[in-house]
Amino acid sequence: MDDERFQQAEMNIGMVGHVDHGKTTLTKALSGVWTDTHSEETRRGISIRLGYADTVLTRCPECDTYSVEEKCPECGAETEWLRRVSFVDSPGHETLMATMLSGAAIMDAAILVIAANEPCPQPQTREHLMALEIIGTEDVIVVQNKIDLVTPEEAREHYEQIVQFLEEETHLDPDKTPIIPVSAQHKANLDVLVEAMYEHFEPPEYDLDAPFRMYIARSFDVNKPGTRPSDLKGGVIGGAIVQGEVEIGDEIEIRPGIRVERYGRTEWEPVYTEVVSLHANVTPVERARPGGLVGIGTKLDPTMTKADRLSGQVAGEPDTLPPVRHELLLEVELLERVVGTEEERKVEPIRTNEVLMLTVGTATTVGVVTSARDDEIEIKLKQPVCAEEGDRVAISRRIQRWRLIGHGVIKG
């Protein structure tokens, strides 16, 4: 189908949950794309970086079955396309929480995957849901996965555990949150999940008249080793457009940009480049708008973009981007207890000279607290961020590893 409405996804849906609960398998069942493509990911069997895949939700006009197929799996009739969506498959491994947090910044809605063959909740189930709450993602569907590995009685007991967890520990109302039993491995009950995604997830409304702005989540060098200099392609950046539109030929600015040493001091300079190609998932487009994940081919030196070097930066129309901040004044709200640890731990107040990890948009940076009062902290960043006043920030503290302890709002 060439309908322009379906060239670009209307929204980003995060796949979140504990390690090995089946997020990547479910993404593949829904999109046909295995998102663990990084060699280390394939070897270790876990997602390390954010993986992306698109799919189109469809419905059969004959028998009303929902699916992601062009031909109805029940009666074979041609299906109607309803909505294109992008999946952000985030890592569930506890040491990779920073990557999950930066992914949450570009999620409009989320599917929380909980394996039926393990007690609920597991540590990262708690932590991922808290991350969604902090970043402000309200639309969540719970998938009770791996139901092929348990008896009907065990599945019912496990369902009750999920309901209790949602009621007692989360911002979600179990009466309004769909909980759908699925076997991603066997593609069982996917029709019910697709219907819930279409009915429950509302694509956000974007300001298309505002200046173009995009959070960069990945950056690449697409050239193979040994490519002739005359055939080299410029660097590629990928991420989520949050406002405005961009066209081939537009000039864009990237902040904070590149680090330069000048008179013994480190400074950051914005980078300017031209858009030479645009891809919505794998579809080449002339113009891109918010919704889904977009790849932008540029004239940048590919060494600048390889291995996610520009991940966490912000691209946009020149002279319209937020300021680059080396220090942040945050109004903070801490959680009552640490999420993600096996044992219960109270969140202690933030102290001066403490080192914290902050996630601002898709950027993750470390900083030292220079001043700490009850609900306000000042923090000097190791790497600057491009951010507006009023932006939300996820705050993590080192407790064996980085643990989510609360959030802040940028005051200056």
UniProtKB/Swiss-Prot annotation:
This is Translation initiation factor 2 subunit gamma. Residues 45-49 are annotated as: G2. Its EC number is 3.6.5.3. InterPro entries: eIF2G, eIF2g_C, eIF2g_dom_2, eIF2g_GTP-bd, P-loop_NTPase, Small_GTP-bd, T_Tr_GTP-bd_dom, TIF2_gsu. Coiled coil: none annotated. Belongs to the TRAFAC class translation factor GTPase superfamily. Classic translation factor GTPase family. EIF2G subfamily. Residues 89-92 are annotated as: G3. NCBIfam families: eif2g_arch, PRK04000.1, small_GTP. Mg(2+) 1 binds at residues 24, 47. Heterotrimer composed of an alpha, a beta and a gamma chain. Zn(2+) binds at residues 60, 63, 72, 75. Residues 8-205 form the tr-type G domain. Its cofactor is Mg(2+). The gene is eif2g. GO terms for molecular function: GTP binding; GTPase activity; metal ion binding; translation elongation factor activity; translation initiation factor activity; tRNA binding. GO terms for biological process: formation of translation preinitiation complex. It catalyses: GTP + H2O = GDP + phosphate + H(+). It comes from Methanopyrus kandleri (strain AV19 / DSM 6324 / JCM 9639 / NBRC 100938). It comes from the Archaea. Mg(2+) 2 binds at residues 20, 45. PANTHER family: EUKARYOTIC TRANSLATION INITIATION FACTOR 2 SUBUNIT 3 FAMILY MEMBER (PTHR42854), EUKARYOTIC TRANSLATION INITIATION FACTOR 2 SUBUNIT 3-RELATED (PTHR42854:SF3). Residues 145-148 are annotated as: G4. It holds the Pfam family eIF2_C. Residues 183-185 are annotated as: G5. Disulfide bonds: none annotated. Signal peptide: none annotated.
